[in-house]
């Protein structure tokens, strides 16, 4: 999802999927005004006749032409602003390749002619929005999950861990286990239906084995969902089985630690002196941390991993779906931030590599 708006606002004005759709077939009716590409919600609503592409994979931009289309759509159709009149703050994944940061900077200054630009790490902004400058952020979105330890406002690069398991993988896994129940979803359009089922009905079990046992003995957790064609499907233990993969990536055939173990591993990579503050400030952010029960389960798992004397505290703010954006809104409206921007003049003098000197 792309979230866009104005500094100082308490929520983004525009939230739309970061997708670009192109017609599968050439339009046969002349004058129908079929465009060669559609972005965001419009691509979503016309998905039946389009091929959808995601320019961002695992949090990192892979297709710059499509990304440019998304930014163009953001400025002109969603926010309705002239980019040359507004400084722009973009967010990036931790460990974003250097060339990617330069490319973002170049497109903003050369294609969109912005007067000033800045790029910040998503997790750091989430922490700001929770009113902290020290803590460890578990940020899980659609394409990637990161655990980022932050001390006094600076991320600790040696402790940053990335897990290539996030919302999109859970949607795919839910598609798979629903097909075992006899409901088949295959196309990119049907995947969106499954994503909706996931967002509305899935939750995290506090004790997976216990929940499996309970669900096999009673139908209390079964819920029904009406598909767009009117067919009603029933979903039972899939509600928590799909999301369990966050804690047990082996369910997806991934040889990786779950979000609990990854958070613990990240803390262990940090200096002894800061661990206590990290354990006491574990902040969740991103849409994939929105499942009911996730904070309680994290509390239970991290407490079991941590030394017994440690006080573990999980912070899961209700607005965490947008906390990266909110942190950006706060940062960009601070008077002290105004000297941080990369100006058009600085860019013209130094070129794209200036981003490494001014944004860290």
From Swiss-Prot:
One of its GO terms (molecular function) is ATP binding. This is Actin. Belongs to the actin family. Its EC number is 3.6.4.-. Actins are highly conserved proteins that are involved in various types of cell motility and are ubiquitously expressed in all eukaryotic cells. InterPro entries: Actin, Actin/actin-like_CS, Actin_CS, ATPase_NBD. It comes from Meyerozyma guilliermondii (strain ATCC 6260 / CBS 566 / DSM 6381 / JCM 1539 / NBRC 10279 / NRRL Y-324) (Yeast). GO terms for cellular component: cytoplasm; cytoskeleton. Keywords: ATP-binding, Cytoplasm, Cytoskeleton, Hydrolase, Nucleotide-binding.
